[in-house]
């Protein structure tokens, strides 16, 4: 879709959406986003220029359909896929990607840590019409084998290689500073971020500052070259309710706010990552603190999970917290699957995670009065009242699941025309009774005696 657009500006010195926006240019990507979100193109340009909205769109991912992340547009959801050292199958990852696209993931992150990472990533980008994000430290550690071998040069080479492939955003753990280590010691669960734990290990062994922080300007230069956005990772996100909103988390968040401004100076788009495990009554506070400390950059959050005991059902736990977070300003929800805390998700887990978080994001969009958000719900209400079963399946966030559950008890085609379902049957259907009542003429009512 974007091949001609990207070709036309391939020789521009800074081909980023933010650069064009700051210079008054409305790109085709901005126009497309404006149409999808039912907003004015100039408004989209202004938000991108201010850093309040990002359009993650690497110039080398030309089959990607433009989308936007920010408070002014509908809440988005991300789905994670990727191999592990114990389970690496490129075909399975492509199947997971297909599930992500089918059920409406707005972005996908390849978090592979095992197998041929370059080939897995190449295949995912080639088959994806949504932005692909990565966490470069995973490949860095995979390639160098030993964390002690990490150098800034190796780090930058890996990021550029992935940017050349078409990665549209990078999670960079640059806000975790050496001076925060004593704060981590006060926690019940320490560091639960994989990238954060690797950086902590490196800093403690070498007694040096975080190399991602030290090389942040060079990382921004690479991102500006390919219009890859930065997703500033929260290495110190709370992994349990006990650690939520603590000094470690907030100290890192303040640094992420500083890094956001530095990236903007280089015309690099930024979103900020957030928690994590957070009690329900602290979610609003966390959203407002990010807005304050990070200058209203889009907030991309994992959950948050308002309880620690939902193992096996954490896609539900996360969706509960995610709805509240999105209502108070989160711009994108990273899905959590039923396998969270338990193992590597399969395609079914991916589907369940996506749908639960699509529900959460959509509920927040309705509550916030976002343009067009409630229209699908109104259409569903009409279809239900008219017993239009096929239309109901079509309008559902998961049409396959809706049809499957209906057909468990009434599989024959004749029941797609029936004015009842298996719950109430033909005699106790409230919709049917209500429709019969509505047919009664007013003249049929007893007249009031004077």
From Swiss-Prot:
Biological or metabolic pathway of the protein: Cofactor biosynthesis; thiamine diphosphate biosynthesis
Residues binding [4Fe-4S] cluster, per UniProt: 421, 424, 429
Catalysed reactions, as listed in the record: 5-amino-1-(5-phospho-beta-D-ribosyl)imidazole + S-adenosyl-L-methionine = 4-amino-2-methyl-5-(phosphooxymethyl)pyrimidine + CO + 5'-deoxyadenosine + formate + L-methionine + 3 H(+)
Residues that hold substrate according to the record: 80, 109, 138, 173, 193-195, 234-237, 273, 300
Co-factor requirement: [4Fe-4S] cluster
Record keywords: 4Fe-4S, Iron, Iron-sulfur, Lyase, Metal-binding, S-adenosyl-L-methionine, Thiamine biosynthesis, Zinc
Cofactor annotation remark: Binds 1 [4Fe-4S] cluster per subunit. The cluster is coordinated with 3 cysteines and an exchangeable S-adenosyl-L-methionine.
GO cellular component: cytosol
Function: Catalyzes the synthesis of the hydroxymethylpyrimidine phosphate (HMP-P) moiety of thiamine from aminoimidazole ribotide (AIR) in a radical S-adenosyl-L-methionine (SAM)-dependent reaction.
Entry protein name: Phosphomethylpyrimidine synthase
Originating organism: Campylobacter fetus subsp. fetus (strain 82-40)
Gene name per UniProt: thiC
């Amino acid at each position: 879709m974007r091949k001609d657009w990207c070709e036309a500006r391939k020789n521009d010195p800074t081909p980023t959406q933010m650069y064009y926006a700051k210079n008054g240019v409305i790109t085709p990507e901005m126009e497309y986003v404006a149409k999808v979100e039912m907003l004015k193109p100039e408004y989209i340009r202004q938000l991108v220029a201010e850093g309040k909205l990002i359009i993650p769109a690497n110039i080398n991912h030309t089959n990607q359909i433009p989308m936007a992340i920010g408070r002014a547009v509908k809440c988005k959801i991300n789905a994670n896929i990727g191999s592990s050292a114990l389970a690496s199958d490129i075909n399975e990852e492509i199947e997971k990607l297909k599930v992500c696209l089918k059920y409406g993931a707005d972005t996908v992150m390849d978090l592979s840590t095992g197998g041929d990472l370059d080939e897995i990533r190449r295949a995912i980008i080639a088959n994806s019409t949504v932005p692909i994000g990565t966490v470069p430290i995973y490949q860095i550690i995979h390639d160098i084998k030993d964390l002690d071998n990490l150098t800034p040069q190796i780090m930058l080479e890996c990021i550029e290689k992935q940017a050349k492939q078409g990665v549209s955003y990078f999670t960079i753990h640059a806000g975790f500073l050496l001076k925060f280590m004593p704060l981590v010691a006060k926690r019940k669960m320490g560091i639960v971020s994989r990238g954060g734990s690797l950086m902590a290990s490196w800093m403690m062994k070498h007694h040096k500052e975080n190399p991602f922080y030290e090389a942040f300007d060079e990382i921004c230069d690479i991102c500006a070259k390919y219009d890859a956005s930065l997703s500033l990772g929260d290495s110190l996100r709370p992994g349990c309710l006990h650690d939520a909103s603590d000094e470690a988390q907030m100290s890192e968040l303040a640094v992420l706010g500083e890094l956001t401004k530095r990236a903007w100076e280089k015309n690099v788009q930024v979103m900020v990552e957030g928690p994590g495990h957070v009690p329900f009554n602290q979610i609003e506070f966390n959203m407002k603190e990010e807005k304050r400390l990070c200058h209203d950059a889009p907030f991309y959050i994992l959950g948050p999970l308002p309880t620690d005991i939902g193992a096996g059902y954490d896609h539900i736990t996360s969706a509960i917290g995610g709805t509240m977070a999105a209502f108070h300003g989160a711009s994108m929800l990273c899905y959590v699957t039923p396998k969270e805390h338990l193992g590597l998700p399969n395609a079914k887990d991916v589907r369940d995670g996506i749908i639960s978080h699509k529900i959460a994001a959509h509920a927040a969009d309705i509550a916030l009065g976002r343009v067009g958000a409630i229209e699908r719900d109104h259409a569903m209400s009409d279809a239900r009242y008219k017993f239009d079963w096929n239309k109901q399946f079509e309008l559902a966030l998961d049409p396959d699941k809706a049809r499957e559950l209906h057909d468990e008890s009434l599989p024959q085609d004749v029941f797609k025309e029936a004015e009842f379902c298996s719950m109430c049957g033909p005699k106790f259907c409230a919709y049917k009774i209500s429709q019969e009542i509505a047919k009664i003429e007013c003249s049929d009512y007893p007249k009031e005696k004077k």
